[in-house]
């Protein structure tokens, strides 16, 4: 893994592999390494050097949460150097272990710590799968048995020209409960896209809805690009493989306002989503 990003790995099962996570790579002109890694609800078995670091400063921040390790000599180590968290020939269970900054106050004061976290962070039961005690997950819907409504067949342009706000809002409001497919492309919006409860939206290769225009100029009077439901709503909303971003002077843009609470566990969610700012080289932002 490279870049100064935060990675979360869940439900990993690594069996009989030399290394599970290699964090030794540095890239770019500034030699960026991995920013942080969280390994959650996972299992390493027969992995002698499970999480390998470079030894360069700064090291990535690491959180291990509900991790089972078996027959592994080292759990966290510096490549060719010291072992930070030793393993065992038997089974070890790590409820909560961390390496990184520990902050004491809101002013940012603190110190870098390495070791077990006690007490472990509280996990609200609403976030857990009651059958396993692990964090609840739901796989990305595929809609393989659906007949989607194709946005571009209903007067909506994906060629990066013209305001598509009204056309998209009309399509969404009149097709609640149906799968609406946005083919790959750029859909410009000069106003707020309103996503009603019951909407099912999917794209292709991160289909882009892009905020543009005077509506989003003023940072003292911010406006929302994607409004999901209204305050107090609950029910079903599914959004996948979409990208929401901005073009040009849009200091007053809030990319998304989410108002919908799940009616059943996992009924309201997003998969494969991106919210980049100044995405690419043609978005008129420096």
Range-by-range predicted roles:
Residues 181-183, 202, 210:
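Beta-strand cores of modular interaction/reader domains in eukaryotic scaffold and signaling proteins
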Residues 1-3, 7-178, 208, 214-219, ...:
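Extracellular "leader-to-stem" segments immediately downstream of a signal peptide or signal-anchor
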Residues 184-185, 198, 206:
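Tight coil/turn sites that cap or link beta-strands
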Residues 170, 179-192:
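C-terminal, well-structured subdomains that either form a transmembrane helix-short loop-helix hairpin
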Residues 188-200, 211-240, 245-264:
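Extracellular beta-strand-rich solenoid/capping regions of secreted or surface-exposed proteins
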